[in-house]
Amino acid sequence: MGLEVVVPRVASVELAALLDGLGAAGLPSALAMVDNVLQGPGAIPPAVWRDARIRTPAGIVTLRRVPSGVAVVVFGNADDALRAAQRTIAETLLALH
């Protein structure tokens, strides 16, 4: 079971812009997987996606499109550092729109 934060009404978000925003917010991150396809270093993120995994220094965070926006999900046993990364990603998503 995961811990989920839903960022409401985020219609579309460019993953490259999100990664740039996270770097500016002090959370250097990389794209690990998009729609069940592994992403290598330097891979260009697709413009359209349903599910993405973001690698942060604290661990992996899942982004999943839901009808009400984008869900930012971590494992239920996430430590404080991973929960902080989850909040930073949610805040950055909100700031992009």
Where do the protein language model's features map onto the residues?
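Charged interaction segments
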Residues: 47-97
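Ser/Thr-rich, low-complexity intrinsically disordered terminal regions
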Residues: 28-56
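Low-complexity, intrinsically disordered/propeptide-like segments
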Residues: 22-25, 34, 41, 85, ...
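Short, extreme N-terminal segment that most often corresponds to the first beta-strand
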Residues: 1-31
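Low-complexity, compositionally biased segments
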Residues: 17, 23, 38-39, 54, ...
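Generic detector of ordered, mature protein regions
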Residues: 18-20, 31, 35, 74-76, ...
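Feature targets compositionally biased, intrinsically disordered low-complexity regions
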Residues: 1, 20-25, 39-41, 58, ...
